[in-house]
Amino acid sequence: MAPKAGKTKPHKSKGEKKKKEEKVLPTVIEISVETPDESQVTLKGISTDRILDVRKLLAVHVQTCHFTNFSLSHQVRGTKLKDSVDIVSLKPCHLTIVEEDYTEEQATAHIRRLLDIVACTTAFGPSKPPVSRTLPKDSEKKESGSTDGDSPTEKDAGDSNSGLSPKPKESEKKSVGACEAQSAEGAAKSDIDMCPPTRLGQFYEFFSFSYLTPPIQYIRRSVRPSKEDKGLDDLFQIDIKVSSGKPFTVVASRTGFYPPGKQQLLCHSLVELLQQISRPFDAAYDALMKAFIEHNKFGNLPYGFRANTWVVPPVVADSPSTFPSLPVEDETWGGDGGGVGRSGKYDKRKWAKEFAILAAMPCKTPEERQVRDRKAFLLHSLFVDVSVFKAVEIIKKIVENNQCSLKDPAALGFHEERIGDLIVRVARDDPDASAKLDRKSDGTQVLEISQEELAQRNLLKGITADESATVHDTSTLGVVVVRHCGCTAIVKVASEFKLNDGHILQDIDIEDQSEGGANALNVNSLRTLLHKSSTPSSLAQRSPNADSEQIRVAKSLVRKVIEDSLKKLEIEPSRYSKPIRWELGACWVQHLQNQASSKSESKKTEDPKPEPAVKGLGKQGALLKEIKRKIDVKANKTEQGKEAPANDTDNTSETEDQKELEKQNEEIEKMWKELVTETAYQRLKESETGFHLKSPKELIEMARKYYTDTALPKLVADFGSLELSPVDGRTLTDFMHTRGLQMHSLGRVVELAEKLPHVQSLCVHEMIVRAYKHILQAVVAAVENTADVATSIATCLNVLLGTPSDTESVYDEKIKWTWVETFISKRFGWDWKHEGCQELRKFSILRGLSHKVGLELVPKDYEMDTSYPFKKFDIISMVPVYKHVACSSADGRTLLESSKTSLDKGKLEDAVNYGTKALAKLVAVCGPYHRMTAGAYSLLAVVLYHTGDFNQATIYQQKALDINERELGLDHPDTMKSYGDLAVFYYRLQHTELALKYVNRALYLLHLTCGPSHPNTAATYINVAMMEEGMKNAHVALRYLHEALKCNQRLLGADHIQTAASYHAIAIALSLMDAYSLSVQHEQTTLQILQAKLGPEDLRTQDAAAWLEYFESKALEQQEAARNGTPKPDASISSKGHLSVSDLLDYITPDSGIKARDAQRKARPKVKGKPGQSPGPVSEENQKDDEILSPAHLTGESSSDKENKSETKSEEKKVENFDLEQSKPQDQLKLVKPEATVHEDDDSDEGWQEAVPKNRFSSGRRTRPSLAKLNTNFMNVTQQPSRSRGKSTNFTSPRTSSNELSISVAGSTSSPASKMFVKSPLNKKQNNSSVVGERPVNDKSALASSACTEQINKPTPMLSPVSVKAGKLFSYKEVALAPPGTIVKIVAEQLPEETKAPQNLDAAKIAVDGPEKVNAQDAESENKHVATETEAENTDCNEQGRVVVGGSELTSSPKEIKNVEVEKAAEKAFPIETAVSNARPGKSKSAQMAEDSDTCLLNKSPTANDSNGSESVIGVKLQKDLCDAELKTVDGETENLPNGDSSPKSSVAADGEKQDACEAQKEMSKKLSASAPPYTPTTIPIFGSIAVPGFKDHGGILPSPLNMPPMLPINHVRRSTPHQSVTARVPYGPRLSGGGYNRSGNRVPRNKPSFPNSTESNGEANQFNGPRIMNPHAAEFIPSQPWVSNGYPVSPNGYLASPNGAEITQNGYPLSPVAGGYPCNMSVTQPQDGLVSEELPGAGSSEEKSGSEEESNNDKNAGEDDEAVGQETTDTPENGHSTVGEVETTSHETCDEKNGERQGGKCWGDYSDNEIEQIEVTS
């Protein structure tokens, strides 16, 4: 363990530190490479890359992947650049490939590469051709078909549940089945039958291209003598048969390849030659390259694989006796299984001496340790490889020679060999499964000491550990334990070497790694095949009797082993002495130090007593304070002096005791110095734990107490919070071992995890796997003839995993379970009965067994429901399993943990700095392509993702995935995590189809490992949902969301934050279907959970409140539409109040139609009021999209009906009568007093992401995520727009403090309310005399405005003012099945009545108990906003049917509801309208239209100071004035508002101009990005991540990047491209007011080069016809497990914790609540016709600017802190919102913009990212 950082380091000034760290920030670099054929390839690299990395990038690029033997030259640096050259030093970054001559070895390697590239067409079994997922139907069928993805239901149905909750499992199947029946119709049946875990046969389908014609059938060395004389440069000849079946002979020479006798055709590359001489090869190879690009155009090509997974490649199943190697490992062409030391040249190495020199090397500074660690890593890796080779070699000899016959008792003894310094001891395993042998690398047998001595040794090592603990412990460093084929070998260095002074000066001479650490030893390559070669005829001749006899013998052997072992186990005494792992001591010290530091911090905060502040004293005041302090100190001393004499007698006895104590301490100190080194003792004293005053025995007892009372409960608590999220036994073991916990405590973990069924399930499965492992190992050890091993293993697996069908099988089943129960009881101290766990995840158990015992199986769909699922030939081989100490860089791991901790706290700049340093450290120690480094790449990718730099994140994660696949295995948890994370990154880069491939692969592996009932799986469901929604499959997305909800409810509880996140995601999904009343119900549950768990002050709670308010307003809009006479949809669902998941699913069943209609008739409430416009559901969709996506970090849960009911009850208590069922006449409003409102915070620990970070982007624009470099320089938030490649640059998501005003901007909603506003511009139609731009205000806009004003007036903790009673909706069934956007939901509207609640605009604070006040404020703001809009309309348009709705008085009790007095409201509304209209005398019609569309924007952002943003400024000002006036005059009372305006009480005026949905649609298509259809500012909250690691380790989700603009404006116009909505996604959901992602956290602006995505760049209006889609930027799930790959836990929290949002901008200014104007310097392309392509909702012309200076000044009051942001954002149209090619400018917009009213300048209220829409694909 590393010592506490910073103790010995001098303090640096903050500025100094920042400067230094800024230098290490990585950036994306484009590397241009010229190929030999003079074409150019552009690679995307990172500034930390070297020439070695460029070679790797070339190897995974389709144009250059077949090049192997070349050097790289640079016009300045010269030729043959070394692999270590940094690419940042190459100016310009343009390289040239120079072909080099071949040696025979290199020519062989070149052929191996070609075979490797084409292997995917033959080696990985059957595959399906890719299917385009553009149409809903196709995607529906493809849901489970895209590579490996399956619907959650499939997995649920097929994979057995945890066994601990079989009942939920059944209901789950049933409800999901119902859902499938409706949404997938005919496909549902097959979906349910297809269960991923049972489809092991599809394991390799993800990599298989067998649907293509193999370009090459074979390549062989030619055995024919060449006809011509062999040339001097010729190396050898090969025979090639290409795809057409035509054979060719090719000569390999030093200069290249050519057909014999045709040297004029000489080509340096074999591919080029074959393309010239064979058209069929050319066509087949070209088709393969195209398939590679379709698979993943950014890299991660499916070759370079090694057979390193327990499931062998399908090609092996055809010839198990020969095991055809994959090309990389094919010895015929120079391949091998990796590693070093095969040749035996290291047999005589002086290991003892070199380990001793390592331990003596200087290691005081990080630099010294890095040098030492590099040598230690290389030496130890070499030692491990040599040891494994030697051990396996000796074991194979023993097994083949049958030297260890079981009939000879002596044979069970040791077989020992000595090889140089190495001693290899091999022993046959005991066929007794109950035998417990300690064969750990640091166990009693290896170290040859007793248990007590071992416990003391490990504890002392742990409590004195530092960065060098591993290297200094040479006795364990030099040990490897290998188990293989029923034997165990212990390899250790002969003896410790005593160094003298001369040796200390020596250095270790060791070779560097080849290929940067890639191609490490694949232990599977050392397999022992279990089938001897035999001809097919001999197999056919075998009689069935022989096979059945063999099976009978094997079965009796298995039965005998179990029976004998069970007898011995039952009489085995319980073990009393428990060992101690050294990690426990290290964690214990850290725990105590953390406690001490927290106490000291609390004391610091408590000690200083607040002194009364006396202002105006200046320096004299400070002087007086100092004098007073001195007097106090003197007085204190004199008092002590007076007391002293009285205590003299006591002092004498005390001194005697003191002497005695000192004597004891001296004795203990002497003893300690004998036990540990002097430096270790000093470390122990400095640790301030007091351990140096205790004896070892006392410490052991204390450590055991810490273990039981603290360590175990803390582990379970971290499981519950999802800070740790193990997905299988391996990750569970790693987490426990890293904390020093023993696996024998699994029983205790199960007891403590009573409320965590997924953790209990993992523990139970791991205990069962271990019980099975002992049986299987004993059976293998008991087999006398190696030829019978395969049969015995298959028979044993049948007994353990099969389903009994006959009497004999039933008996075997009985004794098997008796063994398991007894084993668990004896070894784990837990009483378990298998009857309570009917359904086990048998494939998970099979996988665990294969890992632990070392089995390789054929990939096929094993029928576990039969008695004999396994056959002899299914068991291919046994592979060695070995253990050793891990040796890497402790400093690197510490930096990784620091990075993760910073990420958790939202300190993105620090997280990037630490992550970059950690990566550099691990690259220096382990090499860039070693499995240890992959964890650093992965973590840094997640950190960069949170900063919004998706390009860089993707590049790093691709590197990690490539390493994990090739070095760790295709189903390793780290590999799984990389698939999931990469899917999220691709999604954020708007490559939805590609993202779906990878997320489905991750989901397939999750089902295989942890099953469907796991938080990581639920989190992945949410990611799949958002991607499915992006592919226009809204109903499929809903099914995944329901699955996630049920899963989270079942696993984490109905009141867990993750469950709330699932409710929230579903609420957004429903809103996309216009089912707002259902959204309200689900969001109410979200809010209640968050209020109870986090409190009303938490940002997530506030966000949820904002969303609820938004949904309520939308539901009211629907009610208004209903009054207009639009067809009344089915209200059956909404009338039921909050529905449980199963109830919702019931609505999807076919027979529910009648019930739904009945319910509809009953539930239809009567509504008073005049018809208003029917709003378009545009922004909501986005909202949903984003939100669904955002759950990325969440793991969704779902709850049963009962849970829902109980939840609803509690909700009703907290939020009075949220249940819509209790609705009274709809014309009455029920004001509900929610306790507090919550929203998901992107950075939250629970995986919540900010719903709507401060920035919102302008409504209409459909923008792409801005991918910019991370700029940590706080001096300038804005970065120069990078126009070079049209890259979008930095998005800063501003954050605001809770006291700042939260103002929503039009179109870019900072809160859900703002979304409502967005709608107002929606109806801007030019062809209508009542200009749609000024669109008559309808209730929707009124609500929006009210929300906006509300935000202005309200303090951060917003209370949801209205509980909407929505009554008239389509049935859930109709909603779920209807294509997105086809159903217009209409809900009878209830207008809220509100009481007066004067508030200070600047920092009004609302008490939690004062919701009524908040409600009143909301109403007032609503009125103001509406008034503004109506006024504008009056000025330039004909007024049509305005509906004025006034809020009648509300009593203080939120429960009381009064009728809305429409008439009174109308009377009072007009005066205000007139006043407002007069306020804007000089505005042109178009300007006013723009303003109206922006009225919503009023809240937009306080950055009104922008010179170009006068328009929005005016709007804000007007709205503020209105709000003020209203607030002041509510109920006739006038209060001073910040603006000082007061006016008679007015009511909300809602313009009732009726507008058809189709009109709105037309309008939408006309909009340009900036003023585009009032894009309801929907930002989707992204949920904090996980376990991506998402899995922290592997399970988790990525929260949306902190730095991403919270809202990407979405153009609601439909787009034809398949990923339309993806580009328009908004990263976060609406947010009421300040608050950072988590609690703190700086949003770091990054200039990120855009990732290639050319398909959606053009901006034709007709392109926007696609259905709405979820926010692509929504946070995705990255399962949140904390460990770094390779079992090095980065931190208990996992990598992916969402960052905490700090409220400081990049330039150090506090973020404005509405700082929408974050400059996003995206280079913007101006439309060629010279028109700004879209109106910017707040951008004003120079004309307006002069007219509204006063107002902009006033606006500064509203948000001064936005000033900095605003100034930058308002600069030029380049920074502005002027749209690139998003949408063609319509004539209407042209008119609006003619007057210059809306130039492209960016205004502070504009949240558009300035992103350039066109992104070129460069890779």
From Swiss-Prot:
One of its GO terms (cellular component) is plasma membrane. Pfam families: CLU_N, eIF3_p135, TPR_12. Residues 649-680 form a coiled coil. GO terms for molecular function: mRNA binding. The keyword Amino-acid biosynthesis does not apply. Expressed in the non-epidermal tissues of the true leaves. Not detected in the vegetative shoot meristem and leaf primordia. SUPFAM superfamilies: TPR-like. It is found in: Nucleus; Cytoplasm, Cytosol. The keyword Phosphoprotein applies. TPR repeats lie at residues 892-925, 934-967, 976-1009, 1018-1051, 1060-1093. Residues 1-23, 128-180, 595-619, 634-664, 1152-1360, 1413-1456, 1468-1513, 1527-1573, 1616-1670, 1731-1809 are annotated as: Disordered. Keywords: Cell cycle, Coiled coil, Cytoplasm, Developmental protein, Nucleus, Phosphoprotein, Repeat, TPR repeat. The modification Phosphoserine is found at residues 1244, 1320. InterPro entries: CLU-central, CLU_dom, CLU_N, CLU_prot, TPR-like_helical_dom_sf, TPR_rpt. SMART domains: TPR. Gene3D superfamilies: Tetratricopeptide repeat domain. Its main location: nucleus. Signal peptide: none annotated. Residues 1-17 have a biased composition (Basic residues). Negatively regulates meristematic tissue proliferation by integrating developmental signals with carbon source availability. May act as the scaffold of a protein complex, which sequesters key factors that are required for the G2 to M transition in meristematic tissues. Together with REC2, REC3 and FMT/CLU, contributes to the establishment of the cellular volume devoted to the chloroplast compartment. This is Protein REDUCED CHLOROPLAST COVERAGE 2. It comes from Arabidopsis thaliana. The lineage of its organism: Eukaryota, Viridiplantae, Streptophyta, Embryophyta, Tracheophyta.
